[in-house]
Protein backbone atom coordinates (compact mmCIF):
# COMPACT_ATOMS: atom_id res chain seq x y z
CA UNK A 1 0.00 0.00 0.00
CA UNK A 2 2.78 2.45 0.88
CA UNK A 3 4.35 1.67 -2.48
CA UNK A 4 1.08 2.55 -4.25
CA UNK A 5 0.78 5.81 -2.30
CA UNK A 6 4.33 6.75 -3.25
CA UNK A 7 3.64 5.90 -6.89
CA UNK A 8 0.48 8.06 -6.80
CA UNK A 9 2.48 10.99 -5.42
CA UNK A 10 5.06 10.58 -8.19
CA UNK A 11 2.33 10.45 -10.81
CA UNK A 12 0.69 13.58 -9.37
CA UNK A 13 4.03 15.42 -9.45
CA UNK A 14 4.70 14.35 -13.06
CA UNK A 15 1.15 15.33 -13.99
CA UNK A 16 1.62 18.83 -12.54
CA UNK A 17 4.90 19.29 -14.42
CA UNK A 18 3.39 18.17 -17.71
CA UNK A 19 0.33 20.34 -17.12
CA UNK A 20 2.57 23.39 -16.63
CA UNK A 21 4.43 22.55 -19.84
CA UNK A 22 1.13 22.17 -21.68
CA UNK A 23 0.01 25.59 -20.42
CA UNK A 24 3.21 27.18 -21.70
CA UNK A 25 2.80 25.50 -25.08
CA UNK A 26 -0.81 26.67 -25.27
CA UNK A 27 0.31 30.24 -24.53
CA UNK A 28 3.06 29.99 -27.16
CA UNK A 29 0.53 28.65 -29.64
CA UNK A 30 -1.71 31.64 -28.98
CA UNK A 31 1.18 34.08 -29.50
CA UNK A 32 2.27 32.33 -32.69
CA UNK A 33 -1.28 32.44 -34.02
CA UNK A 34 -1.57 36.16 -33.24
CA UNK A 35 1.76 36.83 -34.97
CA UNK A 36 0.76 34.86 -38.04
CA UNK A 37 -2.59 36.66 -38.21
CA UNK A 38 -0.86 40.03 -38.02
CA UNK A 39 1.48 39.16 -40.89
CA UNK A 40 -1.49 37.83 -42.88
CA UNK A 41 -3.39 41.10 -42.38
CA UNK A 42 -0.39 43.15 -43.54
CA UNK A 43 0.02 40.91 -46.59
CA UNK A 44 -3.65 41.32 -47.50
CA UNK A 45 -3.38 45.10 -47.12
CA UNK A 46 -0.35 45.24 -49.41
CA UNK A 47 -2.10 43.03 -51.96
CA UNK A 48 -4.99 45.51 -51.91
CA UNK A 49 -2.58 48.40 -52.50
CA UNK A 50 -1.26 46.78 -55.69
CA UNK A 51 -4.54 47.62 -57.42
CA UNK A 52 -4.62 51.27 -56.33
CA UNK A 53 -3.49 54.12 -58.56
CA UNK A 54 -2.27 57.59 -57.59
CA UNK A 55 -2.56 59.17 -54.16
CA UNK A 56 -5.34 58.17 -51.82
CA UNK A 57 -6.41 58.99 -48.31
CA UNK A 58 -5.94 56.66 -45.33
CA UNK A 59 -6.27 56.82 -41.57
CA UNK A 60 -2.96 56.68 -39.70
CA UNK A 61 -3.21 55.25 -36.17
CA UNK A 62 -1.48 57.42 -33.57
CA UNK A 63 -2.45 55.42 -30.47
CA UNK A 64 -5.29 55.16 -27.96
CA UNK A 65 -7.80 54.56 -30.74
CA UNK A 66 -6.97 57.91 -32.36
CA UNK A 67 -6.16 58.52 -36.02
CA UNK A 68 -4.92 61.21 -38.38
CA UNK A 69 -5.88 61.47 -42.01
CA UNK A 70 -2.97 60.89 -44.35
CA UNK A 71 -2.17 60.23 -47.98
CA UNK A 72 -0.20 57.40 -49.49
CA UNK A 73 2.16 58.98 -51.98
CA UNK A 74 4.16 55.85 -52.89
CA UNK A 75 1.91 52.82 -53.25
CA UNK A 76 4.58 50.85 -55.11
CA UNK A 77 6.92 50.33 -52.14
CA UNK A 78 6.55 49.35 -48.50
CA UNK A 79 8.84 49.52 -45.52
CA UNK A 80 8.81 46.17 -43.74
CA UNK A 81 10.34 45.09 -40.48
CA UNK A 82 13.08 42.51 -40.87
CA UNK A 83 13.57 42.00 -37.14
CA UNK A 84 15.85 43.32 -34.42
CA UNK A 85 14.39 46.80 -34.84
CA UNK A 86 15.40 47.09 -38.50
CA UNK A 87 13.14 47.84 -41.45
CA UNK A 88 13.86 47.95 -45.16
CA UNK A 89 12.10 49.39 -48.17
CA UNK A 90 10.94 46.78 -50.66
CA UNK A 91 8.66 46.77 -53.65
CA UNK A 92 5.12 45.59 -52.92
CA UNK A 93 5.78 42.27 -54.64
CA UNK A 94 9.00 41.72 -52.67
CA UNK A 95 7.26 42.77 -49.46
CA UNK A 96 4.43 40.32 -50.10
CA UNK A 97 6.92 37.54 -50.88
CA UNK A 98 8.82 38.31 -47.66
CA UNK A 99 5.57 38.28 -45.66
CA UNK A 100 4.54 34.96 -47.22
CA UNK A 101 7.85 33.44 -46.06
CA UNK A 102 7.30 34.76 -42.55
CA UNK A 103 3.72 33.43 -42.52
CA UNK A 104 5.03 30.03 -43.60
CA UNK A 105 7.59 30.11 -40.75
CA UNK A 106 4.80 30.90 -38.31
CA UNK A 107 2.64 28.10 -39.68
CA UNK A 108 5.52 25.61 -39.31
CA UNK A 109 6.09 26.75 -35.73
CA UNK A 110 2.35 26.48 -35.03
CA UNK A 111 2.28 22.93 -36.42
CA UNK A 112 5.29 21.88 -34.30
CA UNK A 113 3.76 23.43 -31.20
CA UNK A 114 0.42 21.72 -31.83
CA UNK A 115 2.20 18.38 -32.25
CA UNK A 116 4.14 18.87 -29.01
CA UNK A 117 0.90 19.80 -27.25
CA UNK A 118 -0.80 16.65 -28.54
CA UNK A 119 2.09 14.53 -27.23
CA UNK A 120 1.86 16.21 -23.82
CA UNK A 121 -1.89 15.67 -23.72
CA UNK A 122 -1.36 11.97 -24.51
CA UNK A 123 1.20 11.74 -21.69
CA UNK A 124 -1.22 13.47 -19.33
CA UNK A 125 -3.92 10.99 -20.30
CA UNK A 126 -1.58 8.07 -19.65
CA UNK A 127 -0.59 9.44 -16.23
CA UNK A 128 -4.26 9.92 -15.33
CA UNK A 129 -5.00 6.35 -16.43
CA UNK A 130 -2.14 4.98 -14.30
CA UNK A 131 -3.29 6.98 -11.28
CA UNK A 132 -6.86 5.76 -11.69
CA UNK A 133 -5.61 2.18 -11.92
CA UNK A 134 -3.70 2.53 -8.65
CA UNK A 135 -6.67 4.18 -6.95
CA UNK A 136 -8.97 1.36 -8.04
CA UNK A 137 -6.45 -1.17 -6.78
CA UNK A 138 -6.32 0.64 -3.43
CA UNK A 139 -10.12 0.83 -3.23
CA UNK A 140 -10.39 -2.90 -3.81
CA UNK A 141 -7.84 -3.51 -1.06
CA UNK A 142 -9.93 -1.54 1.43
CA UNK A 143 -13.15 -3.44 0.77
CA UNK A 144 -14.92 -4.75 3.85
CA UNK A 145 -14.83 -8.53 4.18
CA UNK A 146 -17.81 -10.36 5.67
Swiss-Prot record:
Covalent S-S links between cysteines: none
Gene Ontology CC, one term: cytoplasm
Coiled coil: none
Compartment(s): Cytoplasm
Summary of the function given for this chain in its UniProt record: Molecular chaperone capable of stabilizing a range of proteins. Seems to fulfill an ATP-independent, HSP70-like function in archaeal de novo protein folding.
Family according to the record: Belongs to the prefoldin subunit alpha family.
Family matches, as NCBIfam families: prefoldin subunit alpha
Protein name (record): Prefoldin subunit alpha 1
Gene name for this UniProt entry: pfdA1
Amino acid sequence: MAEDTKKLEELAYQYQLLQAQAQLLAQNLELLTLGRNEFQAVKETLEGLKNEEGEFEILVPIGAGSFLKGKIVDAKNAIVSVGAGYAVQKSLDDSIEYLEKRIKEYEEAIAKTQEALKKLEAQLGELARQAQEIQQKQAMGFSVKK
